[in-house]
Amino acid sequence: MATPHINAPEGAFADVVLMPGDPLRAKYIAETFLEDAVQVTDVRNMFGYTGTYKGRRISVMGHGMGIPSCSIYAKELITEYGVKKIIRVGSCGAVRQDVKVRDVIIGSGACTDSKVNRIRFRDNDFAAISDFDMTLAAVQAAKQKGIAARVGNLFSADLFYTPDVEMFDVMEKYGILGVEMEAAGIYAVAAEYGAKALAICTVSDHIRTGEQTSSEERQLTFNDMITIALESVLIGDKAE
């Protein structure tokens, strides 16, 4: 059952989908981590794949940049393809001095300057939080694999090139761990349609120091984040 943005047949997606922003990262995850991965959609070059990880059927699909883009894909996956869990695996920027480039952040919540969730929630503030069980499973996966991961709030920004640089001071004061562009939207879509969601991000650049990773590194590595996401699915299955 194709949608305007996904041309996969019914049953093409697993009940759990990992979602990076970059479709080429989706391709990398499928080719590197999944067995017997098959491409199931390619509309607008937003690639999606389904395969298995340690025998568990899992899908991966890009969601693009920003809340409007990721909201479209998340909504269609949930309502048209029966997806129950979405794990965003993406990059973020750091503002706190104690957060370093390549750190992994498990986003238990996501603040935002976007008005999209207010439109959804009748002009009220929606508390965009991750699913607790998925968050707990990710923390357990990180510990089991010996991967250091921080847990806390992300900030989902509408503008990549923001003119309000003073807002970074406010974010630091409030303990924001990473700045990205999608988590708050994905959390709200999941809540609206009865699914579950979690965002796991790797710090790709530091807004204060200027340190950054290359675009190639962002596309082809960040394996710790992906490992946590995949292992958390297996842990979650055992807990259910």
Swiss-Prot record:
Recorded superkingdom: Bacteria
Binding site for a purine D-ribonucleoside: 5, 180-182, 204-205
InterPro entries registered for this protein in UniProt: DeoD-type (IPR004402), Nucleoside_phosphorylase_CS (IPR018016), Nucleoside_phosphorylase_d (IPR000845), Nucleoside_phosphorylase_sf (IPR035994)
GO CC annotation: cytosol
Binding residue positions for phosphate: 21, 25, 44, 88-91
Site feature Important for catalytic activity, where: 218
Principal EC category: transferase
Keyword terms, alphabetized: Glycosyltransferase, Transferase
GO terms under biological process: purine nucleoside catabolic process
Keyword Transferase: yes
Coiled-coil regions, chain positions: none
Xref: HAMAP family: Pur_nucleosid_phosp
Subunit architecture: Homohexamer; trimer of homodimers.
Chain's role: Catalyzes the reversible phosphorolytic breakdown of the N-glycosidic bond in the beta-(deoxy)ribonucleoside molecules, with the formation of the corresponding free purine bases and pentose-1-phosphate.
Alphabetical list of NCBIfam families matching this protein: deoD, PRK05819.1, PRK13374.1
This protein's name: Purine nucleoside phosphorylase DeoD-type
Organism this protein belongs to: Actinobacillus pleuropneumoniae serotype 5b (strain L20)
Lineage, uppermost ranks: Bacteria, Pseudomonadati, Pseudomonadota, Gammaproteobacteria, Pasteurellales
